Amino acid sequence: MRKSARGQVCTEAGAGASGDWQDMSSAWGKRAWQDLNSAWGKRGWNDMSSAWGKRAWQDLNSAWGKRGWQDLNSAWGKRAWRDMSQSPWGKRGWNDMSSAWGKRGWNDMSSAWGKRGWNDMSSAWGKRGWNDMSSAWGKRGPEKWANFHGSWGKRAAEPDYEEIDAAIEQLIPIQQLSDNERMEVPEKKAWSALHGAWGKRPVKQAQYNSGSYYWKREPAWTNLRGMWGKRSAPDADAVDDDHESSARDEA
């Protein structure tokens, strides 16, 4: 009995659902789908093929804007396409353009252009030929190109060590450099000397654990502290004098 009751309920539910779908196919929004084939907006689809906006599609093939498509092939703006290719266009024909253009023909352009021919351009351009440009650019010949690398900042093959030594002596005294910075090669010595002048931070030493030395710079920089208003380190003689005066006071 229970199984039969359940089956009856399922069949009734399925029948109700199928009835709803069938009802939707016949009427939706109070208008059937089949009805749309014959009329839509009080005008049928079949009627659209014969008339649209009081003018049929077939009528457009013969006349459009009071002028047919076929008529446009023969005349357009009171001048035919065939007429454009033959005699005049702006009072000058296309064929005439090959012989003269601005009182100078295209063929004439190969021999003269601005009173100078194209062939002449290979030998002279701005009173200097292209071939001449390879030998002179800024009044410098090809044999001097190799010497350009010196002026462009490239290191020469044989550097002048005497000038480098003189520059080192002017930048920083050799006594202020550490042992590992005293190199034999003058070029490396010059680079190592410049890091003090550029303000590069030195390596922190092991005996300075407070971290104050880490913010100090090279000795050449620390000597400038008095000029920048920073308090300089007290002299040893001044410290001894202070101790002696304090000892006398205690005595």
Curated annotation (Swiss-Prot):
Signal peptide extent: none
Keyword GTP-binding part of the UniProt annotation: no
Tissue: Prothoracicostatic peptide 5: Expressed in antennal lobe (AL), corpora cardiaca (CC), corpora allata (CA) and gnathal ganglion (GNG) (at protein level). Expression in AL detected in all animals, in CC, CA and GNG in most (at protein level). Prothoracicostatic peptide 6: Expressed in antennal lobe (AL), corpora cardiaca (CC), corpora allata (CA) and gnathal ganglion (GNG) (at protein level). Expression in AL detected in all animals, expression in GNG in most animals, in CA and CC detected in some animals (at protein level).
Keywords in alphabetical order: Amidation, Cleavage on pair of basic residues, Neuropeptide, Secreted
Region (Disordered): 1-22, 227-251
Localization terms from the record: Secreted
GO biological process terms on file: neuropeptide signaling pathway
Example of a GO cellular component annotation carried by this entry: extracellular region
Tryptophan amide: residues carrying this PTM: 89, 152, 198, 228
Subcellular location, principal: secreted
Residues of the propeptide: 1-77, 93-138, 156-187
Record bears the keyword Secreted: yes
Disulfide bonds: none
Protein name stated in the entry: Prothoracicostatic peptides
Species assigned in the record: Agrotis ipsilon (Black cutworm moth)
